[in-house]
Amino acid sequence: MAPPKFTKTLLARTRGTDTSARRRAESKSQRSTSSRYPIIQTAKLHRNKRNRSPAEPSTVVRRRNTRQTPTETEESTVVCSQTRRRQQRPQVLVETVNRDKPESSSQRAFYLQFIKSIFELGVEGIVKLYNAELRAYFPANITRQAFDKNPTKNRYSDVVCLDSTRVKLRNWSTDYIHANYVKTEVLTNSGFICTQGPMTTTVCDFWHMVCQEQAANIVMLCETMELGKEKCQQYWPRRMNETLEFPGFRIRNMGVDTSDSVTVISLLEVRRVFGSEVDSVSRKCKPHYVRHHLWKNWPDRGVPSSTLAPFRILAQVRPSTSPCVVHCSAGIGRTGTLVAIEACLQTLLLERPLNVVEVIKELRSMRIHTIQTDLQFLFVYKCLIAQGIVRGILPKELGSVSRKFSRDYNSLLATRLAVQPKAPLPTQSPPVPSPIRYPC
């Protein structure tokens, strides 16, 4: 087959000379040297570009690069320069810790030791520990001035909102909302915002807080009605494509996920409304999207039947870089229980000594009254055990001890908890409220 045209031209230029073989050998040597010494080859290329004049013929450049193999001096210079750069580069140690479950061998061993300490304490010992250390515990040097100045915005007069950690609303008609930041050293990202269930007088404040803090998740641990009593205002639309309006806000349900047996997850679109209708200014404002997690049928001042549902919820909200808003009715019992489970789990995953009593005391210094009953305190331990069992941490020889703990736990619940009827979910969405009903 005849060679291409450009190949014929190249052969014509080099025919009759004895340099073609030498050039091929040089090209092969250059490729070999480039693969072995890429730094040297790059340095030579830059040096040639600096020394070459615009009028200099290309043949001169080829003569300057005839020596392709580096000398021992060049090799030692390159090695020394590379070593010097490595020594000058700061050493950064990256901590790779699984923050979702005990996965490494050291995490699993540390987790197992804690579970053994729970079995040694027993159900009765845990209840006694709560009564002795936490039942009457209040943090020292607390102030409640904002709480006392806003009685109409507090759901319960005996559930105090601390001044030191309260969420302050900005660019709003008031700076007060019954909500506190809960941030500890072990909690990931921005921690939690623990708050009471929205009221008719605070529902607009609630949505303003969600937008202000750019919260990506809302965890609701109560029903709007429980045992015939209102525990929380209907502040979000339950069904897909339904809309609920409040003065200044329009909330739309973008989708509902009911695949979990315990929780209902809704994707909500929150838009600010600056007039009676969505005017041109309102349309230009970007909507805020938030996932709403509703835990069905967690009894007030009690404990739910599922001990693994907390970890499923926490795994969904943990990746967010913004604080997670958590509320029940008062925002201290069920809310504090979920936050305590996360704080205890993260302490164990970081392989730090865990004292659950001290964890609760630290949480109460930010959100007072965290965990209201000894059963909720016991539920924290039970969930941590369940997590260890489902991860296969418990050996077979601890099976009998684990079953005894479960029997004692169930027996205590049977004697302490009265049978409570479950409040059914509403069959249809509530009507759109009027601004008069919600004096925000």
Indicate where each model-derived feature is located.
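Cys-based phosphatases of the PTP/DUSP/CDC25 superfamily and their flanking regulatory architecture
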Residues: 1-440
